[in-house]
Amino acid sequence: MHEYSIVTALIEECERHAFANNASKVSRVEIKLGILSGVEPELLRTAFETFKLEGICREANLVMNIQPLVLRCLDCGQSTEHSERSVICSHCQSGQTKVLDGEDMMLMQLELEQA
């Protein structure tokens, strides 16, 4: 389960930002999770709840915003959003597409509290 290593890195990044801003705790962690990121949201949530138990993130709430797949068709030029994992242009049915968004996981926002 690579979600464990991803959560470990996420918590380390949260801690780095918290310490850099003299925060005593992290209360909210917001991430963007692309549907093609290869990360399973429920496994990620379980891993986060497990690994946050010690440290500055122990009371943090994880907010996951699922990012749809955004494609640009190289044939017709249309940009479209897809909620499923399909790289076919929904406008002209071409397979010649470029992924613009929906492949990544990103830390978007932290809510920090100071003592």
UniProtKB/Swiss-Prot annotation:
Assigned keywords, A-Z: Metal-binding, Nickel, Zinc
GO BP annotations listed: protein maturation; protein modification process
Keyword Iron appears in the UniProt entry: no
Positions contributing to Ni(2+) binding: 2
Domain of life: Bacteria
Positions that bind Zn(2+): 73, 76, 89, 92
Keyword Metal-binding: yes
InterPro entries associated with the record: HypA/HybF
GO molecular function: nickel cation binding; zinc ion binding
Family membership: Belongs to the HypA/HybF family.
Function: Involved in the maturation of [NiFe] hydrogenases. Required for nickel insertion into the metal center of the hydrogenase.
Record's protein name: Hydrogenase maturation factor HypA
Organism of provenance: Shewanella halifaxensis (strain HAW-EB4)
Gene coding for it: hypA
